[in-house]
From Swiss-Prot:
Pfam family of the protein (one): GRP
Record's keyword terms, sorted: Cell wall, Cell wall biogenesis/degradation, Repeat, Secreted, Signal
Gene Ontology BP terms: cell wall organization
Gene: GRP
Function: Responsible for plasticity of the cell wall.
Endpoints of the signal sequence: 1-24
Induction annotation: By wounding.
Intracellular or extracellular location(s): Secreted, Cell wall
Name of this protein: Glycine-rich cell wall structural protein
Length: 200
């Protein structure tokens, strides 16, 4: 009888462990799918010319350095913000690297999160394969360079300079059809027949 109850306890423990492992495996996948489904094109206003952005909450204007939409900002091309380069010190990705944020990895390397919608990457902030995209370019030590830009604005620039702006400041092809991430900017319309919202 004792061995039977001991067996039941072991079985219950194994079942609980299996549930924990399954939920741990499932969570990152769900988060990844949520991110992929929710990637938005920010509205950046003007591209910004050498915005001297210092990261944070909008330094250098929406399109230029730092802030939500633009390049790296911060110190040696780091910074971050929602749309720009990799966050942290000397371009380190830190928690903000990759995903919406942009480049990441060590000294501005793209790492897993480099490229895509976020922006730069490559060696010391070079655009590399991940440079450009919607978020913004890279260039040497975070410079926007000629390869910097895409829709989102220039790359980080040297010690946090905004870089060269980008092409058209990230205007939406068919207008805004909703709020952007955390109600900043906008969500671009996905199709030509989607009705843009009236913006105040």
């Amino acid at each position: 009888m004792a061995s039977k109850s001991k067996g039941l306890v072991v079985l219950a423990l194994l079942l609980a462990a299996a549930i924990l492992v399954a939920s741990a495996d499932e969570h990152p996948q769900a988060k990844k799918e949520e991110n992929e489904a929710g990637v938005e094109n920010f509205f950046h206003g003007g591209g910004g010319h050498h915005g001297h952005g210092r990261g944070g909450h909008g330094g250098g204007g929406y399109g230029g350095g730092g802030g939500y939409g633009g390049g790296g900002g911060g110190y040696p091309g780091g910074g971050g913000g929602y749309g720009g380069g990799g966050g942290g010190y000397p371009g380190h990705g830190g928690e903000g690297g990759g995903g919406y944020g942009g480049g990441g990895g060590y000294p501005g390397h793209g790492g897993e999160g480099g490229g895509g919608y976020g922006g730069g990457g490559g060696y010391h902030g070079h655009g590399g394969e991940g440079g450009g995209g919607y978020g913004g370019g890279g260039g040497y030590h975070g410079h926007g360079g000629e390869g910097g830009g895409g829709y989102g604005g220039g790359g980080g620039g040297y010690p946090g300079h905004g870089g060269g702006g980008g092409h058209g400041g990230g205007r939406c092809k068919w207008g805004c059809c909703g709020h952007g991430f955390l109600h900043h900017g906008c969500r671009c319309c996905a199709r030509a027949d989607e009705v843009p919202e009236v913006r105040n």
